[in-house]
Amino acid sequence: MSDMTEIPSPLPGTFYQRPEPDAAPYKSKGDDVAVGEVIGLIEVMKTFIEVKAESAGTFESYLAENAAPVQAGAALARLA
C-alpha cells in the first residue's frame, strides 16, 4: 500500500469542495488524481483560487468540510 499524501491549503480562506453550490464535489473516494488537477477552491475576499494536487494518486477523502474556514497549510484532502 502506498503512503498517504495530504493536499494543503495554499492560503487562508474558505474552502469549497465543489465548483458551484449545486454541483458534485470535484473528487470522490477512489477517483484518480493527476498532478495539477483541481480538487477544490479557496475563496479569499470574493476571489476564488484553485487548489491543485501537487502529486498524483487516488483520492481518499476531503479533510476540510465544504464552506469551512481554513488556515494556510491546513490539510484539505488526502490521496493514496
Task: Show the residue positions of the predicted features.
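Short histidine-centered loop motifs in beta-beta connectors
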Residues: Q17-D32, E60-E65
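Absolute protein N-terminus
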Residues: M1-S2, A80
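Short beta-strand-turn/beta-hairpin segments enriched in glycine/proline and small hydrophobics
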Residues: S2-A23, L41-E54
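Short hydrophobic beta/alpha edge segments that flank linear recognition/processing sites
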Residues: S28-E50, Q71-A80
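PDZ-domain C-terminal substructure recognizer with occasional recognition of PDZ-binding tails
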Residues: G57, Y62-L76
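Amphipathic alpha-helical interaction segments
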Residues: A23-A24, A34, A56, V70
